[in-house]
């Protein structure tokens, strides 16, 4: 049962599921399997060893020896070294020339400094002249002394002596006042009309009326809620 259930998930070789033989999975024996990198690496090593053997044979052969002797006679190595050195020096010279040109351009952009002109100092001799004397009129002084003279008021004793003796009067107004004899006491006589009338409370003529209660549901509502405040409208002219 297990083999039947998991056969769909197993890798297949064609139409046959591979349930037991796991050693062949991922190799070149399967259709669409992994690539054999070991064979490629071994082939590269073999090719490199073959090239090395060929080169060593050619270098140690008689032809190789003659070629090396010819190169030494013609001084090819020295020429190569000289060419490399001249190329390096030429590159350095070109770089130095470019740097010098850039410096000259920047110096030309700057404005030339103007030479400083020394200012000629002319010594002026001061001629002795007589001082001018100007007569100015006398100015009015700003702060003037103001002297105010005032008579002193008389003393209290002097005013008492000069005043007439005080006599009680019968009336408050001076035009109605009369001197009072010393034996009689001073009284203030008032007219009958001057006395204020006795206070008597005014009776209101407004009849007292009780609120009229209507019958039915309105009267019941008035008993529960109350009549409320009476609204009175009055017209006033200002």
Swiss-Prot record:
Motif (PPXY motif): 153-156
InterPro entries: McpVI
Induction data: Expressed in the late phase of the viral replicative cycle.
Motif Nuclear export signal in this chain: 67-76, 219-230
Motif (Nuclear localization signal): 233-236
Record has Phosphoprotein as a keyword: yes
Keyword match Metal-binding: no
Annotated Gene Ontology cellular component terms: host cell; host cell cytoplasm; host cell nucleus; viral capsid; viral procapsid
PTM remark: Ubiquitinated by Nedd4 following partial capsid disassembly; which might play a role in intracellular virus movement during entry.
Domain remark from Swiss-Prot or TrEMBL: N-terminal amphipathic alpha-helix domain is essential for the membrane lytic activity. Late-budding domains (L domains) are short sequence motifs essential for viral particle release. They can occur individually or in close proximity within structural proteins. They interacts with sorting cellular proteins of the multivesicular body (MVB) pathway. Most of these proteins are class E vacuolar protein sorting factors belonging to ESCRT-I, ESCRT-II or ESCRT-III complexes. Minor capsid protein 6 contains one L domain: a PPXY motif which binds to the WW domains of HECT (homologous to E6-AP C-terminus) E3 ubiquitin ligases, like NEDD4.
Miscellaneous remark of the record: All late proteins expressed from the major late promoter are produced by alternative splicing and alternative polyadenylation of the same gene giving rise to non-overlapping ORFs. A leader sequence is present in the N-terminus of all these mRNAs and is recognized by the viral shutoff protein to provide expression although conventional translation via ribosome scanning from the cap has been shut off in the host cell.
Family: Belongs to the adenoviridae protein VI family.
Name this polypeptide is given: Pre-protein VI
Lineage: Viruses, Varidnaviria, Bamfordvirae, Preplasmiviricota, Tectiliviricetes
